[in-house]
């Protein structure tokens, strides 16, 4: 084999390995965490967050979430090898060794903590580590294989990114930060359970007691509906009593929440209809993205609108 051929082969192997490492981190899951983090930062900073702090916090959040997801893949590699949708992942497929996953996770966690501690503050760095600990210790290790409430309690890990973002900007956690935490916490079950309904056969095969497996479709649909009912008033707490966003955001939150409730109600009418569960799962993602966009838009646009109206009023005097 010529030198160029060996070089080409090595480059190809490295490229494949990097792709496997990225797959370990579940990048599609991370995007939504970053959106909620950025929204929390803009609300906390009232639309005046420095681009440097925003980029560092989002980069650190990416590393922290990637570390947690990598450890999750490592721990679950036995059941991933059995489940149809996960058996081709790098660890169960044998493309990545367990020690590589451990090394990658530790490196990512250290990077996340170091960046936040150095360029934001210690509180945000510790919160990021707490997110990893809750996801790995509470959800993955303790609850996922033992309780149908696994995603409810363990879902607290997914609600920590807004706390990290808020703390990075302010150095503290106000009531508004905890409302953001509560919003993600309440949103997680009606987001995840429709997906669990779609793949419940896989969960049953590996004896993971997700609610659709243990309680059935009807009970799951009813629980989803109850959580969506609780989500709308929770999202409005940012308007009152917290007062960190205006009723411009509130109108969007009511509209999105009403449609979410309607979609969830539709599922209760036909719990076994998989297409309704699929549509609800997809809408839950869109709901959170648009809600965060409404927060950011409210904080970025409202001050300029107020200034413009004041200037217009001065001209008309």
UniProtKB/Swiss-Prot annotation:
Protein name: Protoheme IX farnesyltransferase
Family designation: Belongs to the UbiA prenyltransferase family. Protoheme IX farnesyltransferase subfamily.
EC number of this enzyme: 2.5.1.141
The reaction(s) this protein catalyses: heme b + (2E,6E)-farnesyl diphosphate + H2O = Fe(II)-heme o + diphosphate
Signal peptide region: none
Keywords: Cell inner membrane, Cell membrane, Heme biosynthesis, Membrane, Transferase, Transmembrane, Transmembrane helix
Gene this chain is encoded by: ctaB
Annotated pathway: Porphyrin-containing compound metabolism; heme O biosynthesis; heme O from protoheme: step 1/1
One annotated GO molecular function: protoheme IX farnesyltransferase activity
InterPro entries: Protohaem_IX_farnesylTrfase, UbiA_prenyltransferase, UbiA_prenylTrfase_CS, UbiA_sf
Subcellular location: Cell inner membrane
Annotated organism of origin: Thermosynechococcus vestitus (strain NIES-2133 / IAM M-273 / BP-1)
Gene3D superfamilies, alphabetized: UbiA prenyltransferase (1.10.357.140)
Note: Carbon 2 of the heme B porphyrin ring is defined according to the Fischer nomenclature.
Annotated function: Converts heme B (protoheme IX) to heme O by substitution of the vinyl group on carbon 2 of heme B porphyrin ring with a hydroxyethyl farnesyl side group.
GO CC, alphabetical: plasma membrane
Any one Gene Ontology BP term: heme O biosynthetic process
